[in-house]
Amino acid sequence: EPFWAAVRAKFRLNPDYVNLENGYYCFQPEEVLEQFVGHVRRVNFLGSRYMRTVKDEDKDRVRRRLATLAGCGPDELIITRNTTESLDTVITGFQWSAGDEAVMAHQDYGAMLDEFRLMARRWGVVNRYVDIPRNPASDDEVVQLYANALTSKTRLLMIPHLVNITGHVLPVRAICDMAHARGVPVLVDGAHAFAQLDYRIADLHCDYYGASLHKWLSA
C-alpha cells in the first residue's frame, strides 16, 4: 500500500531479514535518528557547560512535551531509562512490612515479577497471582478476577495495560476504580501501550504508570 510504503521509506532497514519484533526495541526513523545523533554531538561539543547550564532546561522541555503526549501534568512525570526502572522505583519505594500482600498476574513482565520476589525475600511480602484468561467472556470477568485476589492485606496491585505475550488490552480504568473502592493503589505497566493505543493516563485513574519511549514510539 502507498501509505505503508511511505512509512517504510522513513526507516533505513537491513534488507537481509524482516523484523517482526518491535516491542523489545524499535527502529528509529532516519529523521529521529539524525536528531538523536545531533543531540549527542551537541552535548559532546558543550561538555560540562551543557551538563551544568543547559541539561535541566532541555529535560524540562522534554518532560512537558511528554506530559502532553501522555495526558498528565509535567509535575507528575519523571524521566527514567525504561519501564522496568520506573516500576521498580515504585515497588522498592513502598514501606513494606512482613505479611503485606501484592497482587499481580502470571502474564506480567518477568522483570517485574522478579522485583516482587525480591520484596518477598527482603521484607516478607506475600505475592498473590492471578491468571488472565486468553479469551475472557467480558471485561467484567477480568475485573472480577483481580477483585477476587484482593484482601484486607493488599498494599499494591500491579496490572499490564497491554499483555506483551498475548496482546490483550486490559480494562485498566475499571480495574483501578474497583481497586480504589477497596483502598488499594494500582501500578500499571504501560510498556506496550504507550504510543500504540490512544489514551490519556489521567483517564485511566491509576496511581502509577510506567512506559518506555524506545518501543512503539520509535524514539
Features from the language model and the residues they span:
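Pyridoxal 5′-phosphate
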Residues: 1-219
